[in-house]
Amino acid sequence: MADYAEINNFPPELSSSGDKYFHLRNYSEYSEYTSGFFLSLMIFIKS
């Protein structure tokens, strides 16, 4: 949340790119979670 507060301190012309960065960071965390889920699923199927 500290990162989002820093993004809100950007000049108005950069606020849209700040939002894009925020969504991109959320997406990377989501993809890490799903890839970890599929990896554990494949290991479970192999064993």
Swiss-Prot record:
Effect of loss of the gene: No effect on iraD expression.
Domain of life the protein comes from: Bacteria
Induction / repression: Expressed at low levels during late logarithmic and stationary growth (at protein level).
Protein name: Protein YtiD
Gene behind the chain: ytiD
